[in-house]
Amino acid sequence: MDQQTPPRARTTGVLLHPTALPGSQVCGSFGEPSRRWLHQLASSGIGVWQLLPLAPPDPTGSPYSSPSCFAINPWFLDAADLSSEGYISAEAMAALPGADAPVDGVGPLDFDLATQRSDALADALVAHWPEQDNSRKDAFNHWCANQAWLTDHVHFMVLHHQHHGPWWTWPAALASHQSKALQDWAAEQGDALLREKLLQWHLDRQWQAIHDLAKELGIQLFGDVPFYVSSDS
């Protein structure tokens, strides 16, 4: 007797990258813009939110060629949530580049301004980190210890910023990932390494909160991954 495959439930989805979500900052974020969007999907009976890769984009803004297949694009970090949680001050948030340039979800995204904003936000996170309580620092350290990709990514990002070019133009010992050279270099970096780690920790925290809300509302997140990791990675 032939067995028939039971019919699958049908649903509707929408493809919208978080960069296009309207909100109070230069680029759509994992804060209120994403929460509002998920509630709109749920109230409209739409069951799937499809996204492009969340990885850092290449210099053209494409997320399909990224320097990392694990890291998240810092543009998505929501400053308002960080301020309300006490990770940065209200004054620091108001001073961020683009504070007077909310995104409407219609016009083009200013890549340079989004990067300037995320850089300034990272600096504010480092500046306010010493005043955070031990429970937050313990959570951060625990997260870092469980991310096998994090150290290499952080080293790469800081070196890339310092040398203003692809890895094959760096000093040979660092470009070839020689352990002693990297250890000696890393020992002198201090806040520069902390800065990149804090960015990724907060991005992961905010993304997990969006993931949890989507599950609560019955919305499936249908993601994508970079086609390939950039040669400059």
Set out the residue ranges of the language-model regions:
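Acidic/aromatic-lined carbohydrate-recognition and catalytic surfaces
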Residues: 2-233
